[in-house]
Every structure is written in C-alpha cells, then in structure tokens.
Swiss-Prot record:
Interacts with STAM2 and MYO18A. Interacts with SHB. Interacts with CD69. This is Tyrosine-protein kinase JAK3. The gene is JAK3. Pfam families: FERM_F1 (PF18379), FERM_F2 (PF18377), Jak1_Phl (PF17887), PK_Tyr_Ser-Thr (PF07714), SH2_1 (PF21990). It comes from Homo sapiens. Residues 24-356 form the FERM domain.
C-alpha cells in the first residue's frame, strides 16, 4: 500500500475507517502503526465486557499482560472513558466505535531516573513500557497531532517544533521502508506529518516561502537520516518532543459542580488528574490549580446520587477522602462521567501504590476481582514470586499463584520444593481454555475453577520434574506489596507493605513524649479504673507569653501494683505522642512525678460501649456505620504509619460528638495502654475475643493484622448493642473458643457478617487491609438495610446525617482558617522572629478538628509583615513529599495580623530528634535523611527558590523514616534573569552555615544552599552534638581574638581553606561529599541533582542492597567520589 500523501485522509476519521451503513456491531480501533489504515476489531451481537475487549485488543497489538493496566477504552472524541467493568450491549440497529488507547501516563517514560517499575534491586528496575507499548504510544501521539485532536498554537516557536516533529516522523518512515530521504519525499509530503492548523497556514503562504520550508525540511531530514538511530529511538524522541510541546496533554480534566451550590458561576469547578501530580482542583474563576492529594494519600472514594431533584436527577456526587480525613467532593453531570473519573484515579492508585486494591466495585477490573477471589497475584515476574516464597521462610509446599506475564490465558504456579542442597523453586503452567476450564500441565483432566484444581494438588496430585509435591500454604497477595506492577517516581517513596515485623521494644531512654510538671496539673473527680490505671478528670495550667491558659484533661495514673508494666505504659504514651490524627486522642504528655500519669485530652461523652448501653436500640444502623467507619479511618492511618495499636475494642472508642441536627457522630480512638506483648496468658485470655489468636500463641508478636481482628470484634460489639457473649465465659472455655476456630454469632445483615468474618479470619494474612474495609463499609452505608432494621425509619430518615456534616464546609476555601476556631494547645517553639504553636482547628467547637502548627510573628512591623507574607507565598507554591505542607493562613480582625497554618509533625525538629534517639539511628538512617533533604532541596532549586537557612533545626521529622524541610523565613526566589540573589539587608543570619560568597558579598544561590547542605551532613553525622556543633567548632578555630568580628574571622578561616573536621566514625564517602559541597568556588560544588544519586547509592550500599565499600573515615585518608 502506498504511503500516505498530503491528500490521504488521516486516522481516526470515521469516514475512512467504518461504513455508516454497518449496524449491529461493536468496533474497537487500534492506532495504525504502519502506512495503512487503523486496525479494527469487530464484535457481534450480545454483551461485551470492557476489560475483555481490552484483552482482545492487547493480543492483537502484541501488548503483554504486565502493561495491560496502562490501557483503556474511550469514545471516538475521547469525551468519555469506560471503566474495565463496563458492559457494552450490541443490538440489532446499533453501531458503536471505541478507541483502544493508553490512558495512564507518567513523566519520562523511557529512562529509569525519574520513573520506573519497581525492582528487587536498583539495578533490576525496568522501564514502564516495552517496545510494543512504545510503538502504540507513538502511533497514538502521532494520530492525535496530525488529526488535530492535540491543540497546537501557531507561534514561530511552536511552528518550528512541529516541523522538527515532522522531520522525525519522516526519518522514521524512511527507516521502516528502507528508503532514502529523497525517495521518500517523492511520495510523502512533509505536510502530512503536521497538524491541520499548521498545514492550512503553510498552504496560504507564498510559493517562495513554501519552497524555502521544503528545502529546510529536506536538509534537516538528511541530517537526521545520517544518524544511526533506529526506528524505536526516533519514536522515543518524537514522543519526548511532543510531550514538551504539550506538557499538560498527559493530564485529564473534568468539569464538575460543587455540592451545595445553587447553580451559577460560583458552583463550577475543575478537577485535574495526572500521573505525576495526583488530583488538583480549582473553583469558579480561580485559574491556579490547587493540589489536593497524590494517589498514595487517598483512603477512600465513594459515588452516590447527588441530592438534587428534577432534571439533575442523574447527577452523581463523588467523594475522595485523604489520609488526614480531608475530603474533596465533586458533582458530575451523570454516572458515566463519575465512573470515568473514579476509574482513572483507581487505575493510577493500583499503578503507584497497591496493585491489588480497588476503591469501589463499580469500576473494579473483573480480572482483579478474580485474582482477589482466587488469592492470585497479578502478572508479577518470577523474581518477585521467588522472593515472596523466601520471605515466607521457603517452606516446602508453599506456593505463589500468579498470572502469566506473557500470556493473558495462562497462570503460573511457583512452588517451593526441598532437595538435598536446600530449597528450590519450580514452576507449573496452568492454561485457561476458551470454554473457561483450567488445565495444569501434567494433570490429566481439566477443572472448572482454580480452587478446584489447586484442591487436587493439596491432596498430593501435583508432580514437578517427576517428584510428587503436596501443596501446604499459599502466599497470597498483601496490601501495598512491591512488585514489577508498581511504578516508582523520583521523589516518591515506593509503597510499604502493611505486613510489618512485630513491634520492637524500645528502651526508656529511646521513648518520645513531652514531660509535664506536677504543679501544672489540677486533679478533679475519679472517673473509674482501667485494667492498669486509675482515671481522673483534671485541668492543665500553662503560662504562655504572660497569659494563663487552662485546658481540661484526662489523667490516667499507672497503678503502683503494676509497676512491672510501666515500660509498656510509657511505650503507649510514646506511640500516641508521635501521631497526629483527628480520630486519635491527643496526648499532651506524661507527668513522671510519683506514679506515672498520662495526660490526654478530655472526651466528654466517654466510651462508645457505655453510650450504646444507655441508648439501647434507639441508635440507628446508619449512626453505627459512621462510628465503625471513623474507627477504620483511624486504624488505616496507623496501618499506613506501620504502627500497631494492639488493643482495639469498643471501650477504647470515645465519643466526642453525639451527632444531631444532620451532623454525624464523631469518635476518637484512645491510647492502647499496656501492650499484649508484656501480658501474661491469663491477662490475654481475659481480652478474648478482642485479642487476636496469634497473640496468645506468640505473646511477643504484635502486628497490624492483630488490629484487624480487634476491629472485627468491635464492629460486632457496636452493632449487637449487647455485652460480648464470650466475655462471661471462664478462661478455659475462652481458650477452647479459639482452639476450635469458632466465630461470633453472625448478624442478620449478610454483608456485615461477611466483613466481620473476614476481619476475624484465624490466618492473619487472610484479613483485609483497612482501605479495603473502608471500601466495604461504603457499600453498606449505601444499602437499604437501615430501612429494615431501624425502629422508626420514617422519623429517622430525614435526620440521618451520613454526609451532611462533611458538606458544611465543602464550598469554603479550605486554606482560610478562621482565627476564632484555632484552639491553642501548646507552644512548639520560639525564636527571635516568631513562635510556633500547636493548635486544633475546631470550627464545630467540639474538639473534632485537625491538629495544625501555627506560626506567628513576635513583632508585626510593616517590614516583618512583608517578609512573612513572602514566606507564606513561597511555601504555598511548594508541593513535595520532603517539604512541610502548607495548610493555609489565618487573619486577625481587619486583617491586621497574619498567621501561617502548616501540618503538625509531632516528632519535632531533626536536631532534637537526633539528640534524643542517637542510640538507635545508624548510618543507614542518617543517609536516608540526607537523601530526602537533598531531594527536597533539588525540588526547591527547580522552583528557583533559595532556602538560605538550611540547618538541622529547620528539618522536621514526620516519622523515623521521613523528614521534611521547613522554615522558609529567609527564603528568596531567584530573578528570572539571574541565578543568584544579593541580599541588601542581611539582618541576623546563621553565619556558620553560610558559604564564603554569602558572608563576603551577601550573594545567595542554589550553590550557597549546597554549602549549607554540606554543613547539614556534618550535623547529621555528629548527631547534632552540641559540643561539636558547627558554631562550636568554628569558634574553637577562631581562638580568643575578641577585637575581630566573628563574621570576618570566620571568612578568613574559610578563605584559608579551613573546614569542619570529619565527624567521628563518619563514612569516608560522606565526608568526601561534605568537602565537595564546601568547594571555595560555587561553580565547583555539585548540584543537588548530582548529589541525590550519590546519596541514594550510599544508602542502598549501607542497607546491603548493592555491593559498595562503606568504611569509617580513617585518620588523614580519604576516598574520592566522582560525579558524572
């Protein structure tokens, strides 16, 4: 077939691909990879599942199952994408045309630097796509450009870029057809490779101009053709250049309404979803998109009918909930648009966070539902299957069932067998026939299901290499498991599996909590007894800036007769002091005077079990569903942090708000108290059925899976409204209950009973993640069970506030915090210019608001206010995992004062954290912090921001494995025409962290931040020891000269080549990095983008992931590092 000429119709024009007279068929178009028309798959009458159509299209295109999740089906005009679960019905008089396209995009598809598929080792990471996917992506992009689907401007720059793309396209054609450029141009016009708007523009030019353009294209084509690049390299270059021409083309946008709006302009909004940015939104005329969350931050997505009547009855309300319980609500004009959005977010979540999770069944891929039902992995590679068996102990007979990475109709069974040399791993092939039966190669007869086939193997019917093998245990998929199905992006940590190791026991010196003096506490009445404590109501008195503060608190005093459990009691306090979440009780601190006393916020309505006993059957099912869903949110937060609670029960669930006048109830999970790991068997038996069975077998084992068992028991407790039937049994019968693997009596509500049964599975690995629990609870909330079970449904339905409480603030600007709702809790820090306080933003006035850190100025003159506003604007524009999150601002009366509201990180600054926990922080952890700070600074540099105050005191600790850069009070944005900034009024400055050019000429740049980063490395590896701090070391070098200013003497030392010494036991490679950062000339210092890979390599080497020499710094000897 002749190549396309200038007049040849371009795909995907329906007139050249389908006849309008064709009826009663469904057609799926694939982008044309050659000179011919697009390939078409046709399907006849009946129902067709969208995912099945995608599989057929993938087979026809040569797409492997590993890459299947990047694709989806869309309408011809791309106005609507279909979820994998969509069913197309083909009738006699209907013809439907669909496009099979890549829907899920990531930046820099082709290298491993910015994004890649996860590998067991860094050198085993693989690219996101392979060559067939690359060819498909090229054909898709080219079709969009030449058909005019991709909007392209007509500026001179854009015209030049489009002509460059045409040259690459022509060079690719010449490679494919083995033609010389001159021969190709005889049959193909370069204008056939341009967008229609540019073709029309060129056609209107004079003959001389058109001739000049043709000559330019011909010369450029000859130069490109002379290169040795193959067709795939030319495709990759084409795609990269096109993505630079239209950087926003990889994102999808959705026009939505805002709930509660009465129509009109103010009720409109826009959602944007992108693989490298997550979800962003804008409202009304606002042009700047506000980031809402990245995909790993999503906990829950729900779809329900919008509360409207009349023509808008088809509208759907989609609610997205973040890990911090903030919600985004958007109203879509119909169900297809809502499902399209949810399917997009759902797919990105599986690609970036958890390949086995789905947020709602309406968009769940049927193949994924089959995998969940059959306990089967997706198309993971053999390396990950073997690694999973090794992680499980390489027990003979253990196996992994997975989809084939090469064939859509095959499964692979990887089995661990024992031979004289140790464990070995064998593979078996399972084929699915067109009729739906399964046949394992080596077995004589097919089976109707995978479960039936594997049951045969469990009975010893499996032979591998002539050896009979009996299957013993299945290594099932776990939430957030790392595999080749996960895409890792630079600046994002790969997902952490929820299956964590048993909780470690910390020494008393390693615990973290605020110590409260005894004379600041006021004791009131006794409220009862806990298992190991006496409980009182009280008040805490503080004096802040000369103002007396009084806070109502709960005092939990450790009983003197249980002093052997003191350490575990303080561990619980340490746990609660390191978390900040609205559904977790706030711990003010611990009073160590006399008997240890835990000081907590006071929750007025008390434990939920006592409340339910008082109200009896008057509490509707919808109210109880809200309670258990909020409890699931709290436990999901702890699961994401890898922190087991260990003592989940209704008595630990406190009711902060009863819920009335359309608002839902609000609960808080209390501290765990004494851990099951230190309790005797008798005490553990007393906690049956809330304590997980594995905790009785191995008392030291406390995992996240135990919390799921306790949650299931608590759900039963809440919905039954009666005393737990097992609690009154004698200890022997309680133990027998577990030994016989009995279950609690099943509620009449079948779906609820199934959820409880899944949470209380006797095999810990069988229990669902809390994200999955929240998803299942959503389906219960949307059901009609309460109409059958509530005593007076007619009276309760109008007051059933399932969502109304959350909608009260949906249309307000979430970044504006009303000052009167910021409730002071304690002071976090105070400096020369300002102070930072811990506050609760509580607009409902019932202690249900989120904890935030609030910064305010000490002196509020015009200059300070201007600098403070600049700091706020800088922080507001920064969005990185390694920079403290901006929440908003709070204005005083008449906007005469301003406060900055940020996320609250309970562990405080890195300097204090290193000093407190030096004993358990090794070099590997310090290198992890260094790498994260470097990534944060690299991001700042990309935004042309100079920090100017980078020091350990300005790094905050989110968790023991995550730090964030904070305090942008001195930060500056570089001018567009310069790479440095000259400060005219330096003021008070941290001179011992400053580069020489900053000290001498007040010049600040990204290179001066690199110098400060070297000082931060020094701080890290000295653990911020005050005796050898940067200031102490430099002052020691200066000697006793009092007449010379410290700044001048410091500058003389630096110009003489004096530098901070190598920290004790600091790895030589790290000290070499410090010295590179301290190069006298800014041009000689490495960039943060060059430092990042070096630190990552050192960190990987310290963890044993790569072969790397990692030695302590010997006296006077150094090892050199090279940067490429």
């Amino acid at each position: 077939m002749a190549p396309p000429s200038e007049e040849t119709p371009l795909i995907p024009q329906r007139s050249c691909s389908l006849l309008s007279t064709e009826a009663g068929a469904l057609h799926v178009l694939l982008p044309a990879r050659g000179p011919g028309p697009p390939q078409r798959l046709s399907f006849s009458f009946g129902d067709h599942l969208a995912e099945d159509l995608c599989v057929q299209a993938a087979k026809a295109s040569g797409i492997l199952p590993v890459y299947h999740s990047l694709f989806a089906l869309a309408t011809e005009d791309l106005s609507c994408w279909f979820p994998p679960s969509h069913i197309f019905s083909v009738e006699d008089a209907s013809t439907q045309v669909l496009l099979y396209r890549i829907r899920f995009y990531f930046p820099n598809w082709f290298g491993l630097e910015k994004c890649h598929r996860f590998g067991l080792r860094k050198d085993l990471a693989s690219a996101i796509l392979d060559l067939p996917v690359l060819e498909h992506l090229f054909a898709q992009h080219r079709s969009d450009l030449v058909s005019g689907r991709l909007p392209v401007g007509l500026s001179l720059k854009e015209q030049g870029e489009c002509l460059s793309l045409a040259v690459l396209d022509l060079a690719r054609m010449a490679r494919e057809q083995a033609q010389r450029p001159g021969e190709l141009l005889k049959t193909v016009s370069y204008k056939a490779c341009l967008p229609p708007s540019l073709r029309d523009l060129i056609q209107g030019l004079s003959f001389v101009t058109r001739r000049r353009i043709r000559r330019t294209v011909r010369r450029a084509l000859r130069r490109v053709a002379a290169c040795q690049a193959d067709r795939h390299s030319l495709m990759a270059k084409y795609i990269m250049d096109l993505e630079r021409l239209d950087p926003a083309g990889a994102a999808e946008t959705f026009h939505v309404g805002l709930p509660g709006a009465l129509g009109g302009h103010d009720g409109l909004g826009l959602l944007r979803v992108a693989g490298d940015g997550g979800i962003a939104w804008t409202q009304g005329e606002q042009e700047v998109l506000q980031p809402f969350c990245d995909f790993p931050e999503i906990v829950d997505i729900s779809i329900k009918q919008a509360p409207r009547v009349g023509p808008a009855g088809e509208h759907r309300l989609v609610t997205v909930t973040r890990t911090d319980n903030q919600i985004l609500e958007a109203e879509f004009p119909g169900l297809p648009e809502a499902l399209s959005f949810v399917a997009l977010v759902d797919g990105y979540f599986r690609l970036t966070t958890d390949s086995q999770h789905f947020f709602c069944k309406e968009v769940a891929p049927p193949r994924l539902l089959e995998e969940v039902a059959e306990q089967c992995h997706g198309p993971i590679t053999l390396d990950f299957a073997i690694n999973k068996l090794k992680t499980g102990g390489s027990r003979p007979g253990s196996y992994v069932l997975r989809r084939s990475p090469q064939d859509f109709d095959s499964f692979l069974l990887t089995v661990c067998v024992q031979n004289p040399l140790g464990p070995d791993y064998k593979g078996c092939l399972i084929r699915r026939s067109p009729t739906g039966t399964f046949l394992l190669v080596g077995l004589s007869r097919p089976h109707s299901s995978l479960r039936e086939l594997l049951a045969t193997c469990w009975d010893g019917g499996l032979h591998v290499d002539g050896v009979a093998v009996t299957l013993t245990s299945c290594c099932i998929p776990r939430p957030k498991e790392k595999s080749n199905l996960i895409v890792v992006q630079r600046g994002h940590s790969p997902p952490t599996s929820s299956l964590v190791q048993p909780q470690s026991q910390y020494q008393l010196s390693q615990m973290t909590f605020h110590k409260i003096p005894a004379d600041s506490l006021e004791w009131h009445e006794n409220l009862g007894h806990g298992s190991f404590t006496k409980i009182y109501r009280g008040c805490r008195h503080e004096v802040v800036d000369g103002e007396a503060r009084k806070t109502e608190v709960l005092l939990k005093v450790m009983d003197a007769k249980h002093k052997n459990c003191m350490e575990s009691f303080l561990e619980a306090a340490s746990l609660m002091s390191q978390v900040s979440y609205r559904h977790l009780v706030l711990l003010h601190g611990v009073c160590m005077a006399g008997d240890s006393t835990m000081v907590q916020e006071f929750v007025h309505l008390g434990a939920i079990d006592m409340y339910l006993r008082k109200r009896g059957h008057l509490v509707p099912a919808s109210w109880k569903l809200q309670v258990v869903k909020q409890l699931a949110y709290a436990l999901n937060y702890l699961e994401d942090k890898g922190l087991p609670h260990g003592n989940v029960s209704a008595r630990k669930v406190l009711l902060a708000r009863e819920g009335a006048d359309g608002s839902p109830p609000f609960i808080k999970l209390s501290d765990p108290g004494v851990s099951p790991a230190v309790l005797s068997l008798e005490m553990l038996t007393d906690r049956i059925p809330w304590v997980a069975p594995e905790c009785l077998r191995e008392a030291q084992t406390l995992s996240l899976e135990a919390d799921k068992w306790g949650f299931g028991a608590t759900v039963w407790e809440v919905f039954s409204g009666v005393t737990m039937p097992i609690s009154a049994l004698d200890p022997a019968k309680k133990l027998q209950f577990y030994e016989d693997r009995q279950q609690l009596p099943a509620p009449k509500w079948t779906e609820l009973a199934l959820l409880i049964q899944q949470c209380m599975a006797y095999e810990p690995v069988q229990r669902p993640s809390f994200r999955a629990v929240i998803r299942d609870l959503n389906s219960l909330i949307s059901s009609d069970y309460e109409l059958l079970s509530d005593p007076t449904p007619g009276a309760l339905a109008p007051r059933d506030g399932l969502w109304n409480g959350a909608q009260l603030y949906a249309c307000q600007d979430p970044t504006i915090f009303e000052e009167r709702h910021l409730k002071y809790i304690s002071q976090l820090g105070k400096g020369n210019f300002g102070s930072v306080e811990l506050c609760r933003y509580d607009p409902l006035g019932d202690n249900t608001g989120a904890l935030v850190a609030v910064k305010q100025l000490q002196h509020s003159g015009p200059d300070q206010q201007r600098d403070f506003q600049r700091e706020i604007q800088i922080l507001k524009a920064l969005h990185s995992d390694f920079i403290v999150k901006y929440r908003g601002v709070s204005y005083g009366p008449g906007r005469q004062s301003l406060r900055l509201v940020m996320e609250y990180l309970p562990s405080g600054c890195l300097r204090d954290f290193l000093q407190r926990h030096r004993a358990r922080l090794d070099a590997s952890r310090l290198l992890l912090y260094s790498s994260q700070i470097c990534k944060g600074m690299e991001y700042l540099g990309s935004r042309r921001c100079v920090h100017r105050d980078l020091a350990a005191r300005n790094i905050l600790v989110e968790s023991e494995a995550h730090v964030k850069i904070a305090d942008f009070g001195l930060a500056k944005l570089l001018p567009l025409d310069k790479d440095y900034y000259v400060v005219r009024e330096p003021g008070q400055s941290p001179i011992f962290w400053y580069a020489p050019e900053s000290l001498s000429d007040n010049i600040f740049s990204r290179q001066s931040d690199v110098w400060s980063f070297g000082v931060v490395l020094y701080e890290l590896f000295t653990y911020c020891d005050k005796s050898c701090s940067p200031s102490a070391e430099f002052l020691r070098m200066m000697g006793c000269e009092r007449d010379v200013p410290a700044l001048c003497r410091l500058l003389e030392l630096l110009e003489e080549g004096q530098r901070l010494p190598a920290p004790p036991a600091c790895p030589a490679e790290v000290h070499e990095l410090m010295k590179l950062c301290w190069a006298p000339s800014p041009q000689d210092r490495p960039s943060f983008s060059a430092l990042g890979p070096q630190l990552d390599m050192l960190w990987s080497g310290s963890r044993g992931c790569e072969t790397h020499a990692f030695t302590a710094h010997p006296e006077g000897k150094h090892h050199s590092l090279s940067f490429s």
